């Protein structure tokens, strides 16, 4: 009777769905390093400028086209 629960626990530990904390940390570090290398950070000002340019060229509204 003890054999079945032990087998199930060992099966769960050996399954690929069980996450390995070290692997997860390494993957997170690699993703972070890749994003830093690719300089994937968005500059909020450039996004706002892009939206304003699109709004001004498409809708020609005074709100979008106003220069400060």
From Swiss-Prot:
Task: Keyword check for Secreted, yes or no.
Answer: yes
Give the range the annotation lists for the signal sequence: 1-19
- UniProt-listed InterPro entries: T-conotoxin (IPR031565)
Q: In which tissues is it expressed?
A: Expressed by the venom duct.
Where it sits in the cell: the answer is: Secreted
Pro-peptide region(s) = 20-53
> What is the protein name stated in its UniProt record?
Conotoxin Ar5.3
Q: Which residues form a coiled coil?
A: none
Mind listing the UniProt keywords for this protein, alphabetically? Disulfide bond, Neurotoxin, Secreted, Signal, Toxin
Q: Which family does it belong to?
A: Belongs to the conotoxin T superfamily.
């Amino acid at each position: 009777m003890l054999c079945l629960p032990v087998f199930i626990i060992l099966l769960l530990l050996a399954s690929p769905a069980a996450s390995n904390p070290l692997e997860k940390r390494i993957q997170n570090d690699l993703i972070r390093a890749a994003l830093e290398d690719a300089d994937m950070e968005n500059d909020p000002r450039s996004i706002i400028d892009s939206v304003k340019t699109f709004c001004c060229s498409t809708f020609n509204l005074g709100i979008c086209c106003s220069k400060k």
